[in-house]
Amino acid sequence: MKERGYIEQLWREEKYHVLLHSQQSYQMIRNALKTDLSLHQIQQMIDDALLIEPSIGSVCNAFDHMWGYFKKCANEEERQQSKLLKADFINGKIDTQTLLDFLAELANKYDVQYLLQSRVLNTKRKR
């Protein structure tokens, strides 16, 4: 595989992980992908983004983006659970990992390979 292929694969695996930490970094990396930066440079940008402490807003934004994969296939109970979990997260009743575990369950149930291959759903966080 050529370096560009590795860069695209890396971004597929990391984009929601980056978005969880920082929308600004996400946008910056998306723009950088339109240039001729090397795999090493993109990896460094991703690593730097993952050092940023996620905010409530960044977690909710990433959750909403990933939830979009299920909007049409989720049943009513799952839709309600999604709203409840997001509200509980905003109010400090649950942590980020609980939201991600819910999305991982749906990704498995509905076989959403793009999300299943995303590192954000395969990385356990401190509670």
Locations of the language-model features?
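Acidic, Ser/Pro/Thr-rich low-complexity regulatory regions
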Residues: 1-127
